[in-house]
C-alpha cells in the first residue's frame, strides 16, 4: 500500500503555537512573542526576564520610613514593558490587573480609572501590548514586580508610530520577487517607514537598495507577516 501525501509548506510559528496550545494546553515550539522579539525589545526598557537585574529602586522620599507611612505607596521608577496578555482580572468597572509575558518573564500590570476605560478593548488574551508606567517591587507577591500603567498601546499602533525602517534580508530570490514584493507592500503604503533590501541581486550585480519615498509603509505586524512569507526573504526586521 502506497499513500502519496501532498507536500505543503510548514506552518508559520504563530499558527503552530496556536495549534499546540489548543491541543496540549501549552507551547512546545517557542513562545508567541518570538516573531516580535526584536520589536518588543526596541519598544521596551528591557525584556521582562531582565527587570530584576536592571531595576534600581528609587531613593525613598522624606518621611517615607515613618511608621505612619507603612501603607503608603512608595515612589516608583519610570519603565516600559512589552509582552502578550495571558490573563486579565477585573475589579468592578474601573480597574484591571493584567499579566504580560514575553517568553523570558512575567509581570502584572495594573490599570485604573480613566486609562482603564480608554484601553479596555485592548485588554484581551493574546493581545500584544506596550505599556508605560511606574515600576515597583510588589511586596504582596513575594518580591516580584508590578507596573502601574500610565499609557498603553497595541504592538501594531506602537510600530506604526515609532518604526522608521523595514529591513528585508534576501537570499535566493526568483524572477517574480519584485512583483510579489510590490503586491505585499501595496496595502501598507503611505506610512513613515522606509524599506531597504539587503542582498538584492540579479544576473548582473548585487546591491543593497532603499526603496523611494513612494514606498514608505505602515510597518505593522500584518505587513511583517506578509513579507516574511515571500520566497527569498530570509529575515524582516523593524528599526525603531
Question: What does each of the following model-derived ranges do?
Answer:
Residues 1-240:
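Noncatalytic, beta-rich nucleic-acid-contacting surfaces in large DNA/RNA-processing enzymes
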Amino acid at each position: 500500500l502506497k499513500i502519496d501525501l501532498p507536500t505543503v509548506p510548514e506552518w508559520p510559528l504563530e499558527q503552530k503555537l496556536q495549534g499546540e496550545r489548543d491541543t496540549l494546553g501549552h507551547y512546545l515550539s517557542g513562545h508567541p512573542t518570538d516573531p516580535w522579539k526584536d520589536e518588543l525589545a526596541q519598544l521596551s526598557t528591557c525584556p521582562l526576564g531582565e527587570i530584576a537585574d536592571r531595576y534600581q529602586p528609587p531613593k525613598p522620599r522624606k518621611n517615607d520610613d515613618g511608621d505612619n507611612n507603612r501603607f503608603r505607596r512608595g515612589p516608583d521608577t519610570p519603565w516600559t514593558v512589552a509582552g502578550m496578555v495571558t490573563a486579565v482580572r477585573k475589579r468592578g468597572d474601573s480597574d484591571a490587573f493584567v499579566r504580560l509575558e514575553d517568553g523570558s518573564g512575567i509581570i502584572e500590570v495594573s490599570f485604573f480609572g480613566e486609562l482603564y476605560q480608554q484601553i479596555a478593548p485592548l485588554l484581551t488574551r493574546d493581545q500584544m501590548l506596550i505599556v508605560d508606567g511606574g515600576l515597583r517591587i510588589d511586596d504582596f507577591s513575594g518580591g516580584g514586580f508590578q507596573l502601574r500603567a500610565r499609557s498603553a498601546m497595541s504592538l501594531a499602533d506602537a510600530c506604526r508610530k515609532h518604526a522608521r525602517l523595514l529591513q528585508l534580508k534576501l537570499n535566493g530570490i526568483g524572477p517574480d520577487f519584485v512583483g510579489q514584493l510590490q503586491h505585499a507592500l501595496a496595502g501598507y503604503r503611505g506610512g513613515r517607514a522606509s524599506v531597504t533590501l539587503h542582498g538584492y541581486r540579479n544576473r548582473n550585480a548585487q546591491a543593497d537598495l532603499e526603496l523611494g519615498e513612494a514606498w514608505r509603509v505602515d510597518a505593522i505586524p500584518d505587513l511583517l507577516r506578509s513579507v516574511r512569507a515571500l520566497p527569498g526573504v530570509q529575515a524582516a526586521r523593524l528599526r525603531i
